[in-house]
């Protein structure tokens, strides 16, 4: 029976993609949590009106989806598990990419900054996937 220390050394594999995913997750978490109190504070929900703006309808589904992807990404960033980092990167890329495209198509000048930020997050999410695509050599 081999007994090791309670706290192991941190996993240093995939450090750059983990930092990217973690920072994106924290930024998105900072935009998502306040939106539960006021859904119109989130750029993706600003055009909704009642009843779709309630948390039991469209706004709640949007925020729930966003929070789920953020939590998966943050868990991947903390644990360093390759597949969770890739899933988090895909979630960030897909969610931010499609939001950016939709905001760019129907948004207008008010959404330009949010659309550009969404595209940047999508590219960073895809970059994190590419960086962990291959397993590290043992």
Which residues does each PLM region occupy?
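Cytosolic juxtamembrane helix and N-cap/initiation of the first transmembrane helix
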Residues: 2-28
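Membrane-helix boundary connector in multi-pass membrane proteins
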Residues: 87, 98-116, 133-135
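Membrane-water interface at the C-terminal end of transmembrane alpha helices
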Residues: 122-138
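Hydrophobic transmembrane helix segments
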Residues: 27-59, 63
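Mid-chain, well-packed structural core segment of small domains
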Residues: 75-105
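Core segments of alpha-helical transmembrane spans in multipass integral membrane proteins
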Residues: 30, 54-77, 90-94
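Hydrophobic alpha-helical transmembrane segments of polytopic
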Residues: 17-27, 62-65, 88-95, 117-124
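Helix-loop junctions at the membrane-solvent interface of multi-pass transporters
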Residues: 37-38, 76-79, 104-106, 131-135
